[in-house]
Amino acid sequence: MSGAPVDVPNPHQEEDDDDEEMPRVQMTRRRFVLGLGLIFAVVALLYYGLPRIAGIDETWHRIEQGDPWWLALALVFTVLSFGGYVVLFRYVYVEGGARIGMRESYEVTMASLAATRIFAAGGAGGIALTAWVMRRAGMSRRAVVDRTIVFLVLTYVVYMVGMLVVGVGLRTGVFPGPAPFGLTVVPAAFAGIAIMIALLIALLPTDLQRRVDEAIGRGGWLARLAAKAATLPASMSAGVRHSIDHVRARDPAILGSIGYWAFNIAVLWASFRAFGEAPPWAVLVMGFLVGMLGNLLPLPGGVGGVDGGMIGAFIGFGVDDGLAVVAVLTYRAFAFWLPTIPGAVAFFQLRRTVARWREERDHGRRTTAMARAGA
C-alpha cells in the first residue's frame, strides 16, 4: 500500500462534521433536478434541433445505421470504465475512511461524476461533494485534501503520460498515423510541462507550514498569512509523494486509473467501428486525449467543449468529418450522458448512506454515555 499516513477518526471531529451541510452550490435537490432538466434539454436539442441545420442532416442520420453489436460493446466498455474509476477511488480513500466500502465507493464516484457533468468545469462539483462525504466518513480536513490530491494525480498522470508518449511517438514515426504539429508536439509539450511541475512540487517539504512558522514566528498577521500560504504547496507535495508511493507499491489504484482511461478510449473505438473504420490506434488515443482538454472550459454541463474539441482533433488528423461527428457524439452519449442517470440515483442513495452513518454515530455516543453513567 502507499506510504500515506493513516488518519484515525476523531470523535470530536465527527461532532463538527454533523454541523456540515451538503455543498449547496453544487448539489441541492432543486439544483440537481434543474441540472437534469438541462441535460434533457441539451439532448433534445442535439437529437431534434441539430439535424435540421443545413448540411449535416445526412451525417446525423448515420446514427440510425450504427451496428448494434458494436454499440452493445461500447456499453460494456462504459461499465468497465466506471468500474475502474470506482476501484481507483476505493484504494485511494480507504485508508482512514473505515466506512468506505465498495458500495459506498460506487455511490460517491457516480454521484460526484454526475455533479461534475451537471454543474462545474474541471471537476469542481464532484470534488466538493467527495470532500463533504469524506468528512462525514470521519476523515480530517487535511486527510481529505491530501487524498483528493492523490486521487487527482493518479487520475491524470495516466492521461498526461499517454499524451506525452503517443504525441512524441506519432511525431517521430514510431507509431503509425498522421502527425500534425499542433495535435502532437503541442499537447505532448503541455503534458511534459505538467509532469515536470508535479515532480518539482514533490520536492517541496511536506512540513513547509511548520518550517515557515519556525522561520517567521507565530505572532503577527504576516506570519499567519505566510503559514496559510504554505499550506496548499505542502498538501500538494504530500499528495504527489503519496501518489508516487502508490505507483511504487503497484497499488490497485493504478490499475483502476489505467482501466478508467483505457476503457473510455475503447468506448470511442467501438463507436467508430459501429459506423465505419476506426482511425489508427495512436490517432484514436491522441484525438481522444486532445479532445478531453475541453473539460477545462467553463461550459454548462461540460456541453460542447469536449465534443467540439474531439471532433476537431479527429478532422485535423484527416478522419472523415461525418464519421468523426457520429462516432464522437455516440461516444459522448455512452461515456458522458448515460452515466448521469445512475449518478443521479447514486446521489440520493448517498444521502441515505450519510444519514445512516449519523444514526450509527449517534447510537454509539448514546451507548458510550450510558456505559459511563452506569460505571
Predicted regions and their residues:
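Hydrophobic/aromatic residues within the transmembrane alpha-helices of Major Facilitator Superfamily
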Residues: 79-80, 118-122, 157, 258, ...
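Membrane-interface alpha-helices at helix entry/exit sites of multi-pass transporters
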Residues: 103-107, 122-127, 136-153, 318-330
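Predominantly cytoplasmic-facing regulatory/coupling regions of multi-pass membrane proteins
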Residues: 1-110, 169, 174-292, 336-375
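Membrane-embedded alpha-helical segments of transport systems
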Residues: 111, 115-119, 143-164, 190-193, ...
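Transmembrane alpha-helix interface/packing and boundary motifs in multi-pass membrane proteins
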Residues: 111-121, 272-274, 286-307
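Re-entrant/interfacial helical elements at transmembrane boundaries that shape
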Residues: 91, 123-137, 165, 300-316
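Transmembrane helix-loop junction
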Residues: 94-95, 117, 136, 273-274, ...
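Extended non-transmembrane interhelical loops and adjacent amphipathic helices
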Residues: 94, 106-137, 230-237
